[in-house]
């Protein structure tokens, strides 16, 4: 976010070692209830509400990940690629392989809510000194 705008939606979480970055004048936009997994790189792109970005995934400039998507661990979403709402995309380069099930959408939202609660517990412990 040092060279552009960084927006993280309500109930979203960015896990350990993940990097959110953009070029000068660019932007990173995470919707609501997004989970960005450990060591993912999210660079100058948009991620829709309820999506899960897997560990070590890479999202490049101007790509768009729709709502309620799953980007598999280690996937590479190339510059400018659009992943439609409700898609599962994996691989290098990423390819949509199927649609997300209702159970997977619910699990993603539950996962995001869990990390919000986890964060509140850590904040309370830190406040105790």
Which residues make up each language-model segment?
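A positional/architectural concept
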Residues: 1-22
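Glycine-rich hexapeptide-repeat left-handed beta-helix
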Residues: 2, 22, 27-30, 37-129
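A general structural signal for well-ordered alpha-helical packing
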Residues: 15, 31-33
